Amino acid sequence: MNLPAYNEFYETRHFMSGSADMGTVQFGGEEIPVGTNLLFSCENVADLCVAAEICEDLWVPNPPSVQHALAGASVICNLSASDEMVGKGSYRRDLVAGQSARLVCAYLYATAGEGESITDLVFGGQNLIAENGTVLAESATFENETNVATID
């Protein structure tokens, strides 16, 4: 797991990287798998296989999404808290588009926005949907919007 510890970020003050090993937790009387390499498929949509990575994973040289795609993921979801800085929005957009092109998949990027509670950084909520290198939908920065796109 990737934790940022550079520039404005210092996540390692509060968190430590988790184990890459798979495990389970008890929830609602059921064993629920947990881990960094889970893939979710849909019985009703043959080619739909979804994987997730977290924020910093996209920004490192070898993101978990590479292994997810090699294992069959067709959609990668990234849950993020990426702040705003001059030029960062276009760089973030290029990262998402590039990753979707490189992995030949859809890449959904959802970042913190309006209502984020931290006082040290500003979060603009730039949410993106890209497929095979093309950005299909993008929210306006500092607007509370829902993005929708058809992924083929």
Regions found by a protein language model. Name each.
Residues 1-152:
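Enzyme catalytic cores with a strong preference for nitrogen-chemistry domains
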